[in-house]
Design a protein with these regions (language model features):
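Mobile cap/lid helix-loop segments that gate and shape the active-site cleft of serine hydrolases
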Residues: 220-260, 265, 272-285, 294-297
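Glycine-rich active-site/cofactor-binding loop and its immediate structural neighborhood
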Residues: 76-132
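Glycine-rich nucleophile elbow surrounding the catalytic serine of serine-hydrolase chemistry
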Residues: 202-214
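Alpha/beta-hydrolase fold nucleophile elbow
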Residues: 192-204
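Cap/lid segment of the alpha/beta-hydrolase catalytic domain
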Residues: 109-192, 229-239, 244
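Alpha/beta-hydrolase-fold serine-hydrolase catalytic core, especially in secreted/extracellular enzymes
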Residues: 8-97, 270-378
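Loop/turn elements at helix/coil->beta-strand transitions in domains of secreted/extracellular proteins
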Residues: 111-113, 145-148, 194-197, 218-222, ...
């Protein structure tokens, strides 16, 4: 049977925590109650294991699917000032093609960090994910600083959407988390990528992908979820909260605790004053900071709050992210500084969508490609 029983589970489960699940006041009270459950490092580690297992079980990823060959397909490399771009497709499962773009620094003959670049939800196909100007800017900027950056399409977006995949599918969370795990496998397979310097960053729904992967996969050493970690908002899309990953018969959690599973690994929360992260400095961040303190790593977590900003990953936010990743992944921040010593993305080329595609008439997708969510053989 191609569609597992989790399809039914995801549609009917009473344990789903969706969207604005709590009021802002309720969320504060919940965090206060949770805080009393862990007063020592060992108590938090026990709680963390319960939450981590809850994510994997709720996503129907226990046991893990067998990891099959990624079989990457590459397009021709394009060279720019200080970095290159090459489109890539990998198989997260046999025939399930995850499409993306690989940004590499000019010099790949030395050990380099690896960064996964995730994206959120947009309505205009030409502004989808990795095709967006803000995504291309950060991907190229980080590559210029010395990182290998893999930006990939989320389920039902970009080239996956063109194949016939749907984003609003009951098992989108499962597929998306698995795709991220395999994207990380691919990143680590690249020659000279340092497994001890692996990061992930993304905004909105991409922020959810960032903290979820960091929560379940300790190969992520540094995480930067942007405009998404909230005590009262659990994500409004099935790819974030459409499976019972926050609640089970023996536990209930939220995205604040899930983000804190990254402790003691470095994490930067980026928040703004115009969405569900507006309370971060006073609500979410202190709780996460408390957990990092229990883990003897209080200095490893930071919050960049931009009260006048709106939801997105614009330059003002990237200016906060570049130094943090440079510090913790040992990147060369000077590579994106202008003559005045300020961060500048002026030399970065924003490519048209057609250049960022893996498959075309000249490079057709293999005949055995899985072209819809319901055809996946787990």
């Amino acid at each position: 049977m191609l569609v597992s029983s989790s399809y039914v589970l995801a549609q009917s489960n009473n344990n789903l925590c969706v969207g604005h699940y709590y009021s802002e006041e309720e969320a504060k009270n919940v965090l206060a109650e949770l805080k009393h459950q862990y007063n020592t490092k060992e108590e938090w580690k026990q709680r963390a294991e319960l939450i981590r297992n809850g994510i994997l079980k709720g996503a129907d990823l226990v046991p893990f699917p067998k990891k099959t060959p990624l079989k990457p397909i590459y397009t021709k490399k394009r060279s720019y000032d200080g970095y290159t771009v090459q489109n890539v497709a990998i198989e997260s499962l046999p025939g399930v093609f995850v499409t993306g773009s690989l940004y590499l620094p000019e010099n790949t003959n030395v050990k380099m960090p690896g960064i996964l670049s995730t994206h959120g939800h947009w309505s205009d196909p030409e502004e989808y994910g990795r095709f967006r100007e803000d995504a291309q800017m950060r991907n190229a900027g980080l590559a210029k600083m010395g990182a290998a950056v893999f930006a990939y399409d989320m389920v039902g977006y970009g080239e996956m959407q063109e194949l016939g995949w749907k984003h609003k599918h009951p098992l989108a969370f499962k597929q998306q988390l698995w795709n991220s795990i395999r994207a990380l496998d691919f990143l680590l397979s690249i020659e000279n990528v340092d497994p001890e310097r692996i990061g992930i960053t993304g905004a909105s729904g991409g922020g959810t992908q960032a903290f979820m992967l960091a929560a379940v996969d300790e190969r992520i050493k540094v995480s930067v979820p942007v405009v998404q970690v909230s005590a009262h908002f659990f994500g409004g899309c099935v790819c974030e909260s459409g499976m019972p990953v926050h609640k089970s018969e023996n536990h209930q959690t939220n995205n604040v605790e899930i983000a804190a599973l990254a402790a003691p690994r470095p994490m930067l929360l980026v928040s703004d004053g115009d969405d569900w992260t507006k309370n971060t400095p006073n609500v979410e961040f202190p709780h996460i900071q408390y957990i990092y303190k229990l883990m003897d790593a209080e200095k490893n977590v930071e919050n960049a709050h931009l009260p006048n900003d709106k939801h997105g990953y614009e330059f003002s936010k990237r200016k906060e992210v570049y130094p943090f990743l440079a510090k913790h992944l040992m990147l060369d921040l000077s590579a994106i500084l202008n003559s005045d010593g300020r961060i500048s993305e002026k030399e970065i080329v924003v490519e048209p969508m057609r250049k960022l595609k893996v498959f075309s008439n000249e490079n057709p997708i293999p005949d055995y490609a899985v072209k819809s969510n319901d055809e996946v053989n787990w």
